[in-house]
């Protein structure tokens, strides 16, 4: 029966180690395993992505995304296995906005969830504006991010074609 207290002590120590590993540690200005820095990294990627979409900078979108990439909307689910296919879809989406006199998009709400050290999601609502300053489309989606080789990529979108609650 002396084994039971030893097992209990081992479990407590291991749980304590695991809990302590989620704390922010700063050594020489480097944040290790910080939820705040992970969320900031997602926010930066979202801003870069939004700016690239507005400016039709498809090479930047290519740099911010990774394949396979999945796009889910109300009508279909599409998986892109090559960057060429993915960028062609982004061009199709972006170019179709020209007839609406698209100017820019603004994020109206954002909720970022870090699932683990590699995967994060962002539930985002946005408005698309025309050059006159009017909103011609409101949308909402969940964007999927994965970290690979210490770099974050957009790997998928679940998109509502209207601003319906997700």
For each of these PLM feature ranges, what is it?
Residues 47-51, 63-78:
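Short, solvent-exposed secondary-structure junction/capping segments
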Residues 87-132:
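Surface-exposed, charged secondary-structure patches
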Residues 17-59, 63:
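Short, low-complexity N-terminal intrinsically disordered segments enriched in polar/charged residues
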Residues 49, 61-62, 69, 86, ...:
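Hydrophobic pocket/interface hotspot
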Residues 65, 75-76, 124-128, 158-159:
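A mature extracytoplasmic/lumenal domain signature
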């Amino acid at each position: 029966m002396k084994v039971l207290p030893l097992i209990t002590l081992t479990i407590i120590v291991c749980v304590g180690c695991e809990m302590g590993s989620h704390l922010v540690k700063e050594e020489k200005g480097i944040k290790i395993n910080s939820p705040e820095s992970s969320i900031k990294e997602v926010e930066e990627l979202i801003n870069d992505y939004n700016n690239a979409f507005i400016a039709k900078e498809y090479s930047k979108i290519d740099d911010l995304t990774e394949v396979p990439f999945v796009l889910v909307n109300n009508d279909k689910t599409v998986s892109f296995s090559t960057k060429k296919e993915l960028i062609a879809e982004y061009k199709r989406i972006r170019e179709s906005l020209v007839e609406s006199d698209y100017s820019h998009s603004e994020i109206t709400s954002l909720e970022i969830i870090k699932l683990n050290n590699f995967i994060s999601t962002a539930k985002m609502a946005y408005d698309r504006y025309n050059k006159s300053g009017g909103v011609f489309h409101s949308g909402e989606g969940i964007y999927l991010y994965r970290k690979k080789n210490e770099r974050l990529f957009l790997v998928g979108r679940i998109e509502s074609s209207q601003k319906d609650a997700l």
